């Protein structure tokens, strides 16, 4: 069953038509590389598929409840006004687990002052849920992703406001990888990565359990990751 279907999509800026009559569909675990010459409208098509831009023709249908993550080529505006550090931004992905953690700490404090079998049972249930949902692993995941994307440990406390545009894009990529959306759309994800980080990302995406759409000028990277290719041609 398709998680996304686009029918007869077209987009124009004034009289300048980028593309027309684009029809595609995505199944779960598809890994699609979107290719085409510069200026053909690849980014515009990604925005339309992600629901971030209304195409001038056609329609896009997405599965109900589909979680979607989108990596822009530049993420400067994504973090405008945010005062988090690099590590704190990663922690936002796990807000639910952190609330559970705080609840468990409160139960522990109460148990230390006034023990009761009922309270101990409640703590046991909370601990089981926390473990089941990955509560004892999420900080390990964060460290793995940050190191993989080239952030040394001494950079994790750096405020987002002090990062370069390329570093902010890497932070956004890391956050998306931790969020694990069902559909992950990546526009030139290797642009701000060194060779080691590109290789790490390649391995991560090859193991990805969701659906991918990737635009990349690195055809070797695409060949290693995707199992389908969409080619966008200039509008006639």
Protein language model regions, located:
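ABC ATP-binding cassette signature C-motif
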Residues: 1-236
């Amino acid at each position: 069953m398709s998680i996304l279907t686009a029918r007869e999509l077209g987009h124009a800026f004034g009289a300048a038509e980028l593309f027309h009559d684009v029809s595609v569909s995505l199944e779960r675990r598809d890994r699609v590389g979107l290719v085409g010459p510069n200026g053909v409208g690849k980014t515009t098509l990604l925005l339309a598929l992600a629901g971030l831009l209304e195409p001038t023709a056609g329609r896009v249908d997405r599965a109900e409840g589909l979680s979607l993550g989108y990596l822009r080529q530049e993420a400067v505006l994504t973090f405008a006004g945010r005062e988090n550090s690099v590590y704190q931004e990663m922690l936002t992905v796990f807000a639910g687990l952190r609330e559970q953690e705080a609840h468990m700490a409160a139960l522990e404090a109460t148990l230390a002052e006034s023990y009761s079998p009922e309270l101990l049972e409640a703590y046991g249930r909370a601990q089981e849920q926390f473990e089941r949902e990955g509560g004892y692993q999420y900080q390990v995941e964060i460290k793995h992703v940050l190191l993989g994307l080239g952030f040394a440990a001494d950079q994790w406390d750096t405020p987002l406001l002090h990062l370069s545009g390329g570093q902010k894009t890497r932070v956004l990529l890391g956050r998306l990888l931790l969020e694990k959306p069902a559909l992950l759309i990546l526009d030139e994800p290797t642009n701000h990565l060194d060779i080691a980080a590109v290789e790490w990302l390649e391995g991560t995406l090859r193991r990805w359990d969701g659906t991918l759409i990737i635009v990349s000028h690195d055809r070797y990277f695409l060949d290693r990751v995707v199992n389908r290719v969409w080619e966008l041609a200039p509008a006639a």
